[in-house]
């Protein structure tokens, strides 16, 4: 164990523990913007600086290991002044229109600036504004990028796709798509990890909420919404509901209040998908088609995009079944239209999904028919759903746990476990 003192508190930590981790483990939250443990420990933002007794210059706490006898100050006048200056410099190259930012209220830079009581930027602003394809499901706003390099490292070290890279030098350093490519030509799987780990609003999903609002306001349209199994486990985080209270039934109630005509749980079409995949597996296995590789699920469009760009030789081993999202859309515009006496073109199908790749999946020409349009007309993420709830002034505490509409409200446990690792395989085995 290593013994040191942080802000007058004597603590003991394991060897090779960084000063930042040592402080956080003992209730001293040193702020940071670029730090991701084991992934991005480059001290680029210099917000995590601390003062080490006996040393004139401040040191970064995220990449300096705690040593025996160290005396550290995380909030001395010298630290506060330097930290404030560093944040002000970052803000001078950041588009500070927070009220129109998707991350407003949950932005790391916004929180740190507020904590440091920064109400004015003393430096001349130099904002890097670049064009971006606004039709692509993943949106990058260069004016908000703070060059923390998180997106680069998460894509390189975790996803192994290296979609992002650094370009330029010195003060002109910025982040862009690797090889100066357009994002639509890059091997991006649309996994959303760069969006999740961006500390500001430089990366976000394309917002499709207005399309859904317009459809709900159109009296000629019958709006049918499906809610993916994974959404029920995460929507409560942004609404303040406890996990046991944030049920799928309350999501359905919220969607009905917004103006949806029918709301279903995607577990119904997940059951359809797994029956198709299980039958296909048995057929291909008995025919000897799976001697070299197993059959891979096609449920996840992010995985399908990844396989096509990185392992094209595995594409023939993907299941030919549509994903639950697309099966749901197809059923709604065929069987369900006949059941309720509507034309396919009068049905507007909406998916509430946890993944940005679902937006790209629904746009594929493979899932388009002249008589009905796309199987799925719009996809919104969990974050977009919560935004719509707030826009409609729906208080989560007032939501009731209601069942899905008939006749697609029934589903097995196999469909529910699609949202966890190994869930699709287990569902196939059950089937």
Where are these regions (language model features)?
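Eukaryote-biased recognition of intrinsically disordered, low-complexity regulatory segments
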Residues: 1-7
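A short N-terminal beta-strand-loop micro-motif at the entrance of redox/enzyme domains
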Residues: 9-15
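Conserved SAM-binding loop
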Residues: 12, 147, 296
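Short strand-loop junctions, especially beta-strand C-caps/beta-turns
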Residues: 7-9, 178-180, 230
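Iron-sulfur-associated redox domains of electron-transfer enzymes in respiratory
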Residues: 15-75, 79, 206-431
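Charged, low-complexity surface patches
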Residues: 12, 134, 144, 187, ...
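Fe-S ferredoxin-like electron-transfer domains
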Residues: 46-190, 196, 203-218, 222
């Amino acid at each position: 164990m290593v013994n040191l003192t942080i802000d007058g508190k004597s603590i003991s930590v394991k060897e090779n523990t960084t000063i930042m981790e040592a402080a956080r483990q003992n209730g001293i939250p040193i702020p940071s913007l670029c730090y991701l443990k084991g992934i991005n420990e480059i001290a680029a933002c210099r917000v995590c600086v601390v003062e080490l007794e006996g040393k004139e210059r401040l040191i970064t706490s995220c990449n300096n290991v705690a040593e025996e006898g160290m005396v550290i100050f995380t909030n001395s006048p010298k630290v506060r002044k330097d930290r404030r200056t560093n944040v002000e410099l970052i803000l001078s190259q950041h588009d500070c229109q927070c009220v129109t930012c998707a991350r407003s209220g949950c932005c790391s830079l916004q929180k740190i600036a507020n904590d440091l009581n920064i109400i004015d930027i003393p430096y001349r602003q130099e904002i890097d504004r670049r064009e971006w394809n606004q039709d692509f499901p993943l949106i990058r706003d260069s004016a908000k990028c703070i060059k923390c390099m998180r997106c680069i490292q998460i894509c390189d070290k975790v996803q192994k796709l290296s979609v992002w890279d650094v370009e330029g030098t010195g003060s002109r350093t910025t982040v862009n798509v690797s090889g100066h490519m357009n994002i639509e030509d890059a091997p991006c799987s649309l996994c959303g990890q760069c969006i999740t780990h961006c500390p500001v609003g430089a990366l976000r999903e394309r917002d499709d909420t207005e399309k859904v609002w317009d459809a709900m306001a159109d009296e000629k349209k019958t709006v049918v919404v499906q809610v993916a199994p994974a959404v029920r486990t995460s929507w409560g985080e942004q609404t303040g509901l406890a996990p046991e209270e944030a049920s799928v039934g309350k999501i359905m109630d919220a969607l009905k209040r917004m103006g949806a005509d029918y709301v279903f749980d995607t577990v119904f079409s997940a059951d359809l998908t797994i029956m198709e995949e299980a039958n296909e597996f048995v057929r291909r296995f008995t025919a000897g088609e799976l001697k070299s590789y197993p059959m891979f699920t096609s449920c996840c469009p992010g995985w399908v995009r990844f396989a096509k760009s990185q392992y094209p030789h595995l594409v023939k081993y993907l299941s030919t079944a549509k994903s639950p999202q697309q099966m749901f859309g197809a059923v709604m515009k065929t069987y369900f239209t006949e059941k309720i006496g509507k034309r396919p073109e009068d049905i507007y199908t909406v998916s509430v999904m946890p993944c940005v790749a679902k937006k790209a999946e629904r746009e594929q020409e493979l899932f388009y028919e002249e008589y009905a349009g796309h199987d799925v007309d719009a996809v919104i993420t969990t974050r977009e759903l919560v935004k719509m709830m707030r826009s409609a002034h729906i208080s989560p505490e007032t939501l009731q746990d209601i069942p899905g509409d008939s006749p697609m409200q029934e589903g097995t446990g196999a469909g529910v476990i699609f949202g966890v690792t190994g869930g699709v395989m287990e569902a196939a085995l059950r089937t």
